[in-house]
């Protein structure tokens, strides 16, 4: 275990300063800390130690100045401050601590073996004493699936954090201990926010692929999320013991579908039920797992004869791929020189950290084979916290970008990336980017500048916790008693920094909900408030017209899980209405308007005139408001009210009451009254002009189109295609494998309700599908007509009441 006091040693000075040898540093440190042993030291030793102390104190002052200089450079000119300069100016003790840390996530398509793989990692690192399966017969379940729902359904719903220590045996026989903060993420698209917030704070990731299916739909989504946050990754091809396993097909798909250079760093010894182990292409040695749970690693110099030709070919392909992304290997390749083991490892690390390459490992987690070599790959090829560039925004300098420096002595900066309710209150997960977070310290929420005290700091192990007194830069922890929202930034008050927010997708499905019993209303409200705080993609709104509470989310499963959690955790049974699609409205043609709002009845009246036009925008996803007033016919404050009216009108369109997209409004003239004009008048006039012009423009209803991927056994291909055609799906591509096929299609969300039960019936329960929002497009004329009539009827019924 690391000594907390060592982490507080000052940083060394800018490169070039003379430093004490490590032995003398330790002596100095002990001399300072252990005053109680002073009587035991020789009197003659005092001057010598004093000399050392004087030199060390000088270094402390220089180091403090160096750290301050680095911080100033990070704020004033972040582009000029390289990550190498930050690393070079780390204190040796601090540099060693950070070099031994890996913050990683496990991400993949559904059922690729993420949680099973994580369970093996925890077992081999000694974090758990026994292996339990995701759908285990012992009613225990995998450690990282701590929710009852997760264990019942066999899926991961929430990302779960843990930590472990991996002892890696180096090539020279030395053993080095590394600290790994690990987050296991869900694979289902409905819980994509869990992957987003995990990748937002991690330094690296393990992307798991199925040896049979290769790159699947959610693999592509995960790849996109990793690119969004610049997360380096290694790849692990799992399920090598399955029938039809073809790891090199998966490697080819990483190259072709994900468009990232990839090459195998291992070759399997056997496949399917004859899978024995792997050949390491870097060291050219065979690796096997022995023991009841594969805990014993056996390394042999002999490479089996049956794979020698494949090993030679794949090593050549590895070197060629590296030559395309790394200059040093390129020079050796052109000179026809064979790179050494050290050169290959260094090149793979450089290219992986530089987001140019992903090394591919192979194994089978369920059969306990080749997981440990993948763990070695995490250490060898994924970055430590000091090697990753992290930026913040300086609120005091108009949100200019600043570079965060992972020094413990710097002012604290952290990000709350996940909230969870526990038996002890709200649990807030925090990534510390700079400085040190200490128990009892006061920190400031950058969003509202509210000061909060940190009463407890814990390290999480799924649903268990271990209390600590402080956490240094580059680490992940959880704190109790901090009232905040997901995505809030925290500082110690010295810096006005805030972190960039994570990407939060818009909900695509809604349904009405209410408690069956009125006596449950209080618990119902508590549950709604908690779920919204924890999950940014879960929205709760109240529709005044229908007098209904609506919940919105990423899919049917997403909302079903929250309804079930409400029943279990809050004992609230709910009634729900049919699913409602998040339709949108858009303008048709350019329409000019000249609208006058005039109400004068003796007292203060309303007067506002707005003139201009409305038209479609270039991009459907956005709305635009512009003013082109010449001569001051409308004052600035009234124009601000006009923009507010435009935004309010876009929130609820006049066609079917849904949000408006792709509409531009321009006001170029108007008129005011000396006494009767007000901000309210211009806001209302703009809304009225909007509604009138919108309805005259031949508007349309837009419906969400879902990128749908269906996989099923080959004998059901005709039935699946027929199912999709009945739903007016546009089939974009079809892939046929050895015993299964995959269909890629665009389907309207409205047409996909109930699809899962029909798919199960058509494929004898063997088919599966995923949906992800793709884009909005015009709904079919008949559907538009039905939606408009339904909306008008609801409006008429409401007015009758």
Curated annotation (Swiss-Prot):
The keyword Zinc-finger does not apply. SUPFAM superfamilies: EF-G C-terminal domain-like, P-loop containing nucleoside triphosphate hydrolases, Ribosomal protein S5 domain 2-like, Translation proteins. Pathway: Protein biosynthesis; polypeptide chain elongation. Residues 99-386 form the tr-type G domain. Belongs to the TRAFAC class translation factor GTPase superfamily. Classic translation factor GTPase family. EF-G/EF-2 subfamily. Mitochondrial GTPase that catalyzes the GTP-dependent ribosomal translocation step during translation elongation. During this step, the ribosome changes from the pre-translocational (PRE) to the post-translocational (POST) state as the newly formed A-site-bound peptidyl-tRNA and P-site-bound deacylated tRNA move to the P and E sites, respectively. Catalyzes the coordinated movement of the two tRNA molecules, the mRNA and conformational changes in the ribosome. This is Elongation factor G, mitochondrial. It comes from Aspergillus clavatus (strain ATCC 1007 / CBS 513.65 / DSM 816 / NCTC 3887 / NRRL 1 / QM 1276 / 107). The lineage of its organism: Eukaryota, Fungi, Dikarya, Ascomycota, Pezizomycotina. The gene is mef1.
